[in-house]
Amino acid sequence: MADNKKSPETGGITMQIPGKGRTNRDWWPDQLNLKILSQNSPLSNPLGQKFNYRVEFSKLDLAAVKQDLRDLMTSSQDWWPADFGHYGPLFIRMAWHSAGTYRTFDGRGGASGGEQRFPPLNSWPDNVNLDKARRLLWPIKQKYGQKISWADLMILAGNVALESMGFKTFGFGGGREDVWEPQEDTYWGSEDTWLGDKRYSGDRELEKPLAAVQMGLIYVNPEGPDGNPDPVAAARDIREVFARMAMNDEETVALIAGGHAFGKTHGAGPASHLGPEPEAAGIEEQGLGWKNSFGTGKGNDTITSGIEITWTPTPTKWSNNFFRVLFSYEWELTKSPAGAYQWKPKGEAGAGTVPDPHDPKKRHAPGMLTTDLALRFDPIYEKISRRFYENPELFADAFARAWFKLTHRDMGPKTRYLGPEVPDEDLIWQDPIPAINHPLIDDQDIALLKSRILASGLSISRLVYTAWAAASTFRGSDKRGGANGARIRLDPQKNWEVNEPEELANVLKILEGIQHEFNQNAPGGKRVSLADLIVLGGCAGIEQAAKNAGYSVTVPFTPGRMDAVQEQTDAASFAVLEPMADGFRNYAKRHLPMKPEAMLIDKAQLLMLTAPEMTVLIGGMRVLNTNFGQTKHGVFTDKPETLTNDYFVHLLDMGTEWTPVSETEDLYEGRDRRTGEIRWTGTRVDLIFGSNSQLRALAEVYACSDGKDKFIQDFVAAWAKVMNLDRFDRIQ
C-alpha cells in the first residue's frame, strides 16, 4: 500500500471529499435534473416538520423589532462604519436586491426564502458588501430567533430604513419562510463568467425568463448597456427588465428615483483590490467576502460597484432632491477612481453641495449614473419624472406603492401576509378573490352535486381536463394561479390554446347551469362557487374512473373557493401563466426553450411536486385520456377513462420497440417486436419514464402486480395536492 501523502495546505492527511469527484452531471450534462423536485426537503430543515412559522410570527413583538432596527440604523460599527452615520441606505439596497431578483415569467427569485444568504446570490457582483449588511442584522436575528425569518427581517430592515429617514411606507406583510439550501430550480443564465451577457440575441432580445442584463446583476448595468454610457440606450434595458419584474413605467421611475434619494455608491479604487466573493473566500473569513486591500478597506475606501457618487445633498433624509439634482444641472461624463463611467454636473456646478460620508469637513458635487440620466433623456420617463418632481406627494405615494409591490410581489395573495402592518387595500397585482359571504356546501350537498355533474353528459376526461387546467396554473415560486377564483372562465385563460376554448366554454356552460340550479334552491343562503364546482367535477370524474377499474375511492374535497371577476384580474399579468408546455396534458408549443421532458420537470417543480407525485400523475392522466386535443399519444390502455396502472405496464413492456417518427424526435411509435405492428404512439414526455433511470425506477413501482392499489392511492393524493395548492385560506 502506498504511503499516505501529506496535504500541503493542512499538513495533515489528504482526504477525499465526499461528492467532490466527477459527478453524473459531469459525465452526462444533458441528464434531467430531478434534484429540483426534492430540494427544501424536511431533512435539510433544522426546525423540523412541526415548526409553524405563522404561529411563531404571531408571537413576535413587531414594534420591538422595529425599534431595535431603528437603533441599529445609527449605531455605526468600527468594522463596517455607516456612511453619513446611517445604515439606512445599505439596508435599502439589501432589501431591494433581495426582492429584485423576482421575474414574472416563472415567478422565481424574489425575497421569499431569504435566498440572498446562499449562492449564487450571496456572491453576485451586484451584491458586493451586502454580506456586511446581513452581519449587522445578526444580533437582531439572534435576539428574536425563529419568530422572524431572515427573509422577513431583510425586507423589514429596508422598510424601517426608509421610515427612519422620514419616509412613510405603504405597509409590511410578514410570512416569508426561510429556505435552508441554494435553490437549484432557478435558471440565472448560461454564462460561465460574472457579468457575461450571452443572454441576448437579434436586436438585443433578452432571453426568457431572465430579468437582468448580465450574469450576476439584479437589473441593469448602471454604467449603461455593456458599459456603454448611453442614457437613452440604458432606458431600453431598464424598461425591459423592470417590465419582467411586473413594473410599469411609473413604478420604474418611482423605484429608481425613490431608492436613489438615499445614500451613495462606492468606487474608491480599482476592483483588483477586492478579494474573493463569500463562496470563494478563505475559511477564516467566516462567510464574508470581497476583502478590500485599498486603504483601510472600509469607510471612504470602500469598493462596491466601482462607481463613486452621492446623488443628493440629503442622503439620509427623504426628499424630492433626486429630481431637483437630475433636472437642475447639465451633465458631463467622467470616470470614478475605479475607472467606472459616471456623470457629474458640467464644470464646477454643484461643487460643495453634497456631504462627505465620513469626513464632516469635506463637501462634494452630486453625481448620477447613466441609468439615472435615462429618467431625464427617455421621453416617456422624462414626462413621468417631471410630474413627480412637480408633485412631491404624488411621487411619495407612487414610491411607497412600488416599494411595497417590489418587496411583496412574490408572496402571492394577501391571505398569506402576517402582522399588524398589512394594508387594508386590495391591490390588483395580489390577484384578489372575494371573501366567503355565504354558508358552504356540506357532505350531502357534495354528493348531490357529484351525481348531477356525472349525469350532465360531460365525460370523465373532460371533467378531469378542466379541473387540471384550472388548478395547474399555480406556481409555488410566487404563489400565483390555481383553481381558486375560477379565473379559467376569464380573460386571458379562457382563450389559451392549451385550455381548448370551445370545449372549455361548453364545460363551463354546463357547470354554470348546475351551479345556478343548486344556488336557486339551496336552503339558508347556501351556495356553491364555480371554482368549487370545477374542482368537484374533477373529483367526480376520478372517482368514477376508479369505479370503472373496480375501486371505490373518495377524492378529498374541501369547499370554500370563490369566484373572482374580470375587474379583479389583470389580463396582462396573468398572461405569463400560460404554459408553453404541459407534459401532464401532453401539450407543447413549437420552439420550446428546453426539451419537453425538461419542461415537464420545470412544471412539476412549480407545482411543488415530488418525482413520485409527478410520475403517478402522468400515468393516471394518460389512462384518463386527458391529452390536449384528445391525442392518443401515451394513452397506453385499451380502457380509457378507467383508472388503472396500464400506462406503466405497457410502457415498460419489452415486447415493444420504440422508434422516432419525426425529424425533431418528439413523437415515437411503439411496435410489436415480433410482428412489427404499431401498438402505441408516445411523446418524449411519455418515453422519459422508461428511459431515465430514476423515473423508470419509479414507474416500475406502479407497474408491478402489487402496485395497483398504491397507484390509485398515490394518484388520488397527488391530485388532491394540486387541487389545493392555492388554498391559503385554509391555513388561517
UniProtKB/Swiss-Prot annotation:
Modified how: Formation of the three residue Trp-Tyr-Met cross-link is important for the catalase, but not the peroxidase activity of the enzyme.
Residues the record marks as site: Transition state stabilizer: 93
UniProt-annotated stretches for the region Disordered: 1-26, 344-365
Gene Ontology molecular function, alphabetical: catalase activity; heme binding; metal ion binding
Keyword presence, Amino-acid biosynthesis: no
One GO CC annotation: cytosol
Active site positions, chain numbering: 97
UniProt EC number: 1.11.1.21
Cofactor note: Binds 1 heme b (iron(II)-protoporphyrin IX) group per dimer.
Catalysed reactions, semicolon-separated: H2O2 + AH2 = A + 2 H2O; 2 H2O2 = O2 + 2 H2O
Crosslink position(s): Tryptophyl-tyrosyl-methioninium (Trp-Tyr) (with M-245): 96-219
GO terms classed as biological process: cellular response to hydrogen peroxide; hydrogen peroxide catabolic process
Gene3D superfamilies tied to this protein: 1.10.520.10, Peroxidase, domain 2
Biological function: Bifunctional enzyme with both catalase and broad-spectrum peroxidase activity.
Similarity comment: Belongs to the peroxidase family. Peroxidase/catalase subfamily.
UniProt name for this protein: Catalase-peroxidase
Underlying gene: katG
